[in-house]
Curated annotation (Swiss-Prot):
Membrane topology recorded in Swiss-Prot or TrEMBL: Multi-pass membrane protein
Comp. bias intervals (Basic and acidic residues): 59-70
Gene name for this UniProt entry: Camlg
Record PANTHER family: CALCIUM-SIGNAL MODULATING CYCLOPHILIN LIGAND CAML, GUIDED ENTRY OF TAIL-ANCHORED PROTEINS FACTOR CAMLG
Modified residues (Phosphoserine): 53
Taxonomic lineage of the native organism: Eukaryota, Metazoa, Chordata, Craniata, Vertebrata
Lumenal topology ranges: 206-210, 287-294
Name under which the protein is recorded: Guided entry of tail-anchored proteins factor CAMLG
Knockout-associated phenotype: Conditional knockout in B cells results in significant reduction in the number of mature follicular B cells with normal cellular proliferation but increased cellular turnover.
UniProt organism field: Mus musculus (Mouse)
Length: 294
């Protein structure tokens, strides 16, 4: 197959060589059409116009109405492609193409804007919903904690008011002079026993044993004898310390047990004071009356 020369700028087309079959002629014509179409596209893009292309322009103007009808039936992307390529040919067909392209371009822009705005709105709505849910999740524990703290504060305030009323009611009874009720029979027995023990220790035992060993033995005996003595009713005294402990959240049972322990320690300390004071007093009397007494 001989090489076929390309089309010149003047628009002259070389004749097809003779002696070719029908299929070869068809292929040659297709190739020439493709070359011409590519040249025309390049010239349109670059802005060149061939002077001898009047007949071709007429053919193009005739085919433009058909192209406009096809454009109306085609989709939006095909219209946009043709608008980008664009024809530099003047005439009514070009005006129609421009109008169609503008209308379709505006429609395309509106649709694209709607498609773009819809995901943005949905994303904004989703972000707002997430922020609201997060805010609700973070607000729920804070509200619960504040509600719990408020309830605790109110309960403690009520307890403080009750303790205040109890303190006010107990003060007149203490001022009336009913202190004799505090000393029961067992308490008096303890004090008398400590004084007698101090006398006996000073008279007979101080040479051989420590003065505190008999006292500890007596306290152990008191712990066993406490069961056999009648128990008087103990009035629970409400003090500022107990009120403060209750308001701080310590249970009342723990406070009562601690108060009982402190009262027992106070009794033991009182017994020790009586015992030691009696012992020293006896010792001074013996030294004053008889210097020879050991």
């Amino acid at each position: 197959m001989e090489p076929v020369p390309a089309a010149t700028d003047g628009g002259e087309r070389p004749a097809t060589p003779s002696g070719l079959s029908a299929s070869q002629r068809r292929a040659e014509l297709r190739r020439r059409k493709l070359l011409m179409n590519s040249e025309q596209r390049i010239n349109r893009i670059m802005g060149f116009h061939r002077p001898g292309s009047g007949s071709e322009e007429e053919n193009q103007t005739k085919s433009k109405p058909q192209d406009s009808d096809k454009l109306n039936s085609l989709s939006i992307p095909s219209v946009s492609k043709r608008v980008v390529l664009g024809d530099s040919v003047d005439g009514g067909g070009a005006d129609q193409l421009g109008g169609v392209a503008e209308v379709r371009g505006t429609q395309l822009g509106d649709k694209l804007d709607s498609f773009i705005k819809a995901p943005e709105c949905s994303s904004k709505d989703g972000a707002e919903l997430r922020q609201r849910t997060r805010g609700d999740l973070t607000a729920d524990p804070a509200q619960r904690a504040s509600h719990h703290g408020l309830e605790q504060y109110l309960s403690r305030f009520e307890e403080a008011m009750k303790l205040r009323k109890q303190l006010i009611s107990e003060k007149p009874s203490q001022e009336d002079g009913s202190t004799a009720e505090e000393f029961d029979s067992f308490r008096i027995f303890r004090l008398v026993g400590c004084a007698l023990l101090a006398l006996g220790v000073r008279a007979f035992v101080c040479k051989y044993l420590s003065i505190f060993a008999p006292f500890l033995t007596l306290q152990l005996a008191y712990m066993g004898l406490y069961k056999y003595f009648p128990k008087g009713e103990k009035k629970v005294k409400t003090t500022v310390l107990t009120a403060a402990l209750l308001l701080s959240g310590i249970p009342a049972e723990v406070i009562n047990r601690s108060m009982d322990t402190y009262s027992k320690m106070g009794e033991v300390f009182t017994d020790l004071c009586v015992y030691f004071f009696t012992f020293i007093f006896c010792h001074e009397l013996l030294d004053y009356w008889g210097p020879e007494v050991p």
